[in-house]
């Protein structure tokens, strides 16, 4: 089902993901702790869990916690600017700051992160196969997709990036809209409008139907990894429930409309689930509105619409 090579491959992917993360220093610290002592014995323990579904998972699950990270901070300088006062100063500090918005970052033992990464490799790759070409953010890399379908548990993943390069896809998303607008103006002589918008509080307004994902696994997943995929999906659902239980005392205050929703910030799987959650929205935009250009990068959306001269 799961071998040492597969676990180490998932760990290397996670380690690479942590390296390029800009704000998740908790994950970076967990990576350092995990491989500092008895690395192979810890890997063996994860393999044994997949072989027997033992009680280790419950111990790991109970260690899931949440760190509150400031997302938006205001000071009296910001208030004065919004009030219409022209206030120029090279003093960038204030005596008091007010935290206006926070993010709830999941923290967990490395074993939990590895299970999450394995879900991304095997289940996430299957979901990503059906995403629209209009989706640019957090797409699974071709090497990871290939690995998930090879069913060779003796091999390790050579490439270590779960997702395609951020900067490449971001540039394609942004430039695609601009280039399409130029093309419509020059070729068709029509006026165009470029609309840019973002989805507010996106991750906290997502509800994941894991039963629906189970049904997709049953219908579309390769037979050789179907049982593994269902097992991973079951465990990820429990991890999501634990995360929501942890944030529930706070989220009713900060995001009252999202008390029963939300996916963990800090999991690789959450990036994939966010794309899956909007898959029908992406298809409806293309089929029902059919703008000259539609592109979505996570929660940032670009439309290009033309108007007949």
Predicted regions and their residues:
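Conserved two-metal-ion catalytic palm core of "right-hand" nucleic acid polymerases
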Residues: 1-231, 257
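Conserved polymerase palm-domain catalytic core
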Residues: 181-298, 302-309
């Amino acid at each position: 089902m799961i071998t040492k090579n597969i676990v180490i491959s998932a760990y290397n992917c996670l380690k690479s993901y942590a390296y390029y993360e800009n704000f998740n220093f908790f994950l970076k610290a967990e990576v350092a702790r995990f491989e500092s002592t008895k690395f192979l014995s810890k890997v063996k323990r994860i393999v044994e869990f997949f072989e027997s579904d033992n009680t280790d998972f419950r111990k790991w699950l109970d260690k899931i916690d949440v760190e509150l990270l400031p997302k938006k901070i205001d000071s009296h300088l910001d208030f004065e600017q919004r009030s219409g006062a022209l206030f120029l100063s090279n003093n960038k500090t204030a005596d008091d700051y007010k935290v206006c918005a926070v993010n709830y970052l999941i923290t967990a033992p490395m074993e939990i992160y590895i299970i999450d990464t394995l879900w991304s490799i095997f289940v996430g790759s299957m979901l990503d196969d059906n995403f629209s070409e209009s989706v640019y953010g957090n797409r699974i890399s071709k090497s990871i997709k290939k690995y998930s379908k090879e069913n060779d548990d003796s091999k390790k993943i050579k490439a270590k990036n779960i997702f395609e390069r951020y900067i490449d896809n971001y540039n394609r998303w942004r430039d695609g809209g601009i280039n399409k607008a130029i093309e419509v103006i020059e070729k068709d002589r029509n006026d165009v409008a470029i609309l840019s918008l973002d989805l507010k509080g996106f991750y906290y307004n997502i509800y994941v139907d894991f039963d629906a994902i189970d049904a997709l696994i049953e219908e579309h997943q390769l037979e050789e990894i179907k049982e593994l995929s269902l097992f991973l999906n079951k465990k990820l659902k429990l991890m999501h429930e634990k995360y929501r239980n942890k944030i529930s005392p706070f989220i009713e205050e900060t995001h009252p409309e999202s008390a029963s929703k939300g996916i963990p910030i800090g999991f690789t799987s959450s990036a994939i689930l966010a794309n899956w959650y909007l898959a029908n929205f992406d298809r409806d935009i293309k089929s029902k509105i059919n703008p000259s250009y539609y592109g979505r990068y996570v929660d940032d959306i670009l439309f290009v619409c033309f108007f007949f001269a």
